[in-house]
Amino acid sequence: MLTLGKKALSVPILQGGMGVGVSLGGLAGAVAACGGMGCISTADAGYREPDFARDPASANHRALTAEIRKAKQIANGAGMVAINAMVATQDYAASIRTAVEAGVDAVVSGAGLPLELPGLVNTMEVAIAPIVSSGRAAKLILRRWAKEFGRTADFVVIEGCKAGGHLGFAEQDLFSGSCQTLDEILPEVLAEVKPYEVQFGHSIPVFVAGGVYTGADLAHFTRLGAAGVQLATRFITTYECDASQGYKDVLLNAGSEDVRIIHSPVGMPGRALNTPLVQAMAEGRRFPPRHCARCLKTCDPAKVPYCITHALIEAVKGNLEEGLFFCGANVGRLDRMYTVRELMDELVTEWRQNR
């Protein structure tokens, strides 16, 4: 068993949060039921609610509570149910408080430095974890948490440059291929967490993500000192994934040559499929938002090239023309549908064979 805060995992596998609506209670609960950590994305979790357009905040909080409870019911006491909360979102603090009240087991936070996270999670019963892309980021966050809140991380997630969605790397490094590898970042982060393990008297497990695809990858990184791994894209082609079958089919039909690095309205680079929307952005076209859900802290509707909320909602519905389909670098390896249990069993078997 791998202890993370007050809870434990029987399998050292985290499912990465995917918004909008890709990882909700169905997927997260199924992963947790297998002994891993399932993760619900807080990003517009209420996009299907009837009042979402009129009152997105209320819709999102109501849906987030329902999805956490759904996941916990499916898990039936196994594994852990987490949320992924993006620092860049307008509703960041409120969504975390909602999740804590709903009984979530852990809060994982990235898309910016989650410097204030311990102050938003007012109980030690809920584990907290930053997502980092360098030892420097881990050092900055852990130092701030210890000094300002007298608390440290219960675990840390390293997201490497091959991850899908928003990326914590400079665009020029992503385009040139000069980003640090996970093999290089992992020892840096392990060195940074060590003093805080001593100070707070407990281990701080480190998980790696971004390009992780097989149980052999899990074995490789655990040999290097990681506690486990996080996968996201591989979980999209599970039957339990909360996205539409149309969304899953788009990824199943994609090849590695279809992947692009984009600049997101969030203000960060991201990895996504080269869909008609992405092609239009590359041509300098603009699609002014028809309605603003006030999802991002930094978004200016008068200037933004497109509405990321609209694009991600259209994607999760399977709309290839208007959707933004985030994906990891290994999306071209997806070739079939499977259950979460089948995927988890495959990963664990490969891990045991290779460790």
Predicted features, each with a name:
Residues 22, 212-213:
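Residue-level detector of alpha-helix initiation sites
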